[in-house]
Amino acid sequence: MSGVDLVAVYGTPALVAHLANAAVLPVRIDGAAFTLFSLAKWPGVRRFPRIALAMAPARRLTVDPALRGWARRTALADALYTVMARAALDAYDQNRSVFDALLDARSRFGRNTRILEDAERQPLTYGRLVLGSVALGHALTRAAGRGGARSWASCCPTPRRLAITIFALQAFGRVPAMLNYSMGPDALVTACRMGRIRTVLTSRRFIALARLEPMAAALAEHTVLACLEDVRKEVGPLDKLWGLAVSWVPTLMRGRTAPAGSPGAVLYTSGSEGTPKGVVLSHANFLANVAQIAAVVDLFPTDRVVNPLPVFHSFGLTAGLFLPLLVGVPTCLYPSPLHYRAVAALVAERKATVLFATDTFLTGYGRAPSEGELASLRYAVAGAEPVRESTRRLYRDRFGVPLLEGYGATETTPVLAVNTPTHGRAGTVGRFLPGIEARLAPVEGFAEGTQLVVRGPNVMLGYYVAERPGVLHPPPGGWYPTGDIVTVDAAGYVRIVGRVKRFAKIGGEMVSLARVEADAAQHWPDDTHAAVGLPDPRKGERVVLVTSRAGAQHDEFVAFARARGIPEPTVPKAVLWVETIPTLGSGKVDYPTVRRMAENALREAGARQAGLKNVPSSKDVILDGG
């Protein structure tokens, strides 16, 4: 819906309630779409569907009394929309495990409804997904015994099998720890030690194809590697019978799964700014974020989702897997977001209506396809990194597809704010999801913006850290400091200024490295850029811009900055060209590696200027300026 549609739907009842000084009683009717008389044509239609009625406390709509005419009507419609979105969140049952929610979705949308597939083209129905998860989980539990470790790491070859493994562990109270195999052997061993993980589920074929033998060898020294090829042989008739029974009678699992407040999964921070930490998320965290997103984003069982993001990333796990599965949307998972042409073709083949990805990957998908391959999309959702205007323009002009930018963190499961079809504003990450409490804390030295601190049902249970393995470190009072500097306008739209850690202090002035990257994106919109702050003997720090722009010249960028009136401290002192900007498995820029590249390039340049001989030179970097 557009903003006009929002007023058309909510404007009149909101205005009537306001003029009558009446309170609004939010009522949510859930299940009516499954009746024989429904026009929705959703799967799971039956003669006598279960109808749930949920009522929230009555509330009065308040707006600025100075508003008149259309402005007041729009504000009232928006206020009523906010009330109803919160009512939708409150009506969703978050007091259960994720697997219980999957069983409920199976009952609601039908056992034979196809819901999940991947690049292997072997679709799973709800019934087969439940059967496979319960059979595998029963076999794993039987093999480990009741006293087995609660946390099991997962590093599986295909998204579909990984999804089954996640639900298998959750179904029997185990906690899947999602290992990012691109982290490197040492980081993976540290991740396992953090959560006291003793068993890692993986695959010999996956290890061989991805050439991960060093990773497997390192993990094998500290954990037990359980290969799925062997585990499948251990799934016996009793396990399959139990899975079949639950797939037909989901209530057999009632009371057997973990409590809502217990850990549902462990994910790891990207390490884009330092050592990764283990983020412990509860079942209630996942279900709350699913409900928060579903309350504001129109996602229906008639949609089709393509998710190329890895599920060891919180965006890929919550938004790309749990959300569509639990609201009845058929989902296709793809194992690598880097296969641009293949993902674009998959969207066309599946006639997908929703695509989840990051800005970097969306740019690749937008440039790769033939004419019309992305035409089926209703919208694409971008997260994990800022969306460039060039990407937004590419999707709007070439495909007519709106690009909805969101924002969050692994610690918030992950979504905190998102632009939606009804509420969107370019240059922002949208408005906070219902249920989010935000505190804006001033930070010394920052002229614009404040640090965002949040609390809500989707905020993590706590961290695992390398220094104290297995010890949970909860956020004080439930408040999580995001480390992001933001501004929030009068309409509630959030704009990210930068990160506290991603500022350089130059002569006492705080310079946003994100601002430097944004300026570079304006000058060279078709390339990727990363800015880092390095020590400077005179001014404390200096900014170095690392770019994939071939032939990038420092003087050229300085001229551009002067023409645009960009403040002098924000102009990088050196421009470093690299063939490819290093990224993590999530698609985020790998800033520690970028920083090391910049340090090495500056050190080599300084040595050459000093007249030293035999100074090694990096093959793929060219430094200009400095």
Region locations from a protein language model:
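Conserved C-terminal "lid"/linker of ANL adenylate-forming enzymes
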Residues: L228-E229, A504, V532-P535, V544-S548, ...
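Gly/Ser/Thr-rich phosphate-binding loop
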Residues: A226-L228, K240-L244, A352-A357, G366-R425, ...
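Conserved AMP-binding/adenylation subdomain of ANL enzymes
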Residues: L287-R304, F312-T353, A368
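AMP-binding/adenylate-forming catalytic core of the ANL superfamily
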Residues: V200-T202, G456, L461-G462, I485-T570
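Conserved ATP/PPi-binding loop(s) of AMP-dependent carboxylate-activating enzymes
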Residues: T428-G435, E444-H473, E509-V511
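Conserved pre-ATP/AMP-binding loop-to-beta segment of ANL
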Residues: L225-Y268, G274-T275, D298-R304
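Structural core segment of the AMP-binding/adenylate-forming
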Residues: A171-L241, T358, R549-Q553
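A cross-family acyltransferase "interaction/gating" segment
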Residues: S2-L67
